């Protein structure tokens, strides 16, 4: 179904965005401790 494909795409995008946000947060924290 088309909506299922859209849902999967949205989920993948959200996952990538979450990973990027986590990476940025980890970067900021590690730089703050140095």
UniProtKB/Swiss-Prot annotation:
GO terms for biological process: defense response to bacterium; defense response to fungus; killing of cells of another organism. Expressed by the skin glands. Disulfide bonds: none annotated. It comes from the Eukaryota. It is found in: Secreted. GO terms for cellular component: extracellular region. Pfam families: DD_K. Keywords: Amphibian defense peptide, Antibiotic, Antimicrobial, Fungicide, Secreted. Belongs to the frog skin active peptide (FSAP) family. Dermaseptin subfamily. Potent antimicrobial peptide with activity against bacteria and protozoa. Also has activity against fungi. Probably acts by disturbing membrane functions with its amphipathic structure. This is Dermaseptin-S2. It comes from Phyllomedusa sauvagei (Sauvage's leaf frog).
